[in-house]
Amino acid sequence: MATTALTASKTPGIIVAEIRMMSASFSGVHFLVEGDDDSKFWKPRVSSTSATIVNCEGKPNLLGASALIQRLGISSVAGVYDPDFERLFGVTHHPNILTPTDHNDLELTLIASDALNSLLHEFGDPAQIADFERNQGVTVAHYLEATSRQFGQLRYLSGILRHQVDFDRLSPYRFVSADTWTLDRSALISEYALLSGLTAPDVETLVQTHCPQAPNWCLSQGHDTVRVLAQGLRRRIGRKQISEQDVARVLRIAFSLELLQQSVMYRSLRSLETTLPAALFS
């Protein structure tokens, strides 16, 4: 199985041209993914002989290419995209050829599964985890969700109110202590207020007014959650100087075939597979 990528930045038109060019010598499935991490996850999981991964270099490109593919009647394409917060609004995209990840993005889908337990077994310290959970009164997973949600609420707020905040300035590494694995919410809110031209009380009011009481993980974002987890593993629940790239890699490995087959996205892709000219999975 090849993983197609161009050196220049892609556009929907370039992606479709790439698929057409490959179709001259390849009669299998062109599987659209958003980026490099998605490609790394799916490469060992789709068929090595009848499917090729197309890295679209971003969600806008993937959705734009999918719209063009449907207009042109190209029938050899399927794909997966991150729904982000769109699921809260009931928004879906091109269900005839695409399926969303189970949670807001692929990383979050992996974290919300039993792959998290495998990662904690590998990189966490059992005694420290037990002590942390005893003191907090919740599991590591529940604490991770509650902490990452607070970053996600601000992402949601920025999106719906068009605050255009640079979230590189709001990295969990700045606001979550590696020593205690606690969030300095006051500092986080103050920084968001500074970046959006608001006051901290205004931000708190907007969070209460506009952010829904959504189920677990629905207001979290994968990169934030991975960074929060990496901070905890460095001292409070482990003793590993582990990077977010390491966390993401181990989660991909730990997400077993059994976990994949239990996922909604897998069942949706299996359903789409019946319309494709070749097998997506081996």
Segment roles from a protein language model:
Residues 1-282:
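Acidic, divalent-metal-binding catalytic cores of TOPRIM
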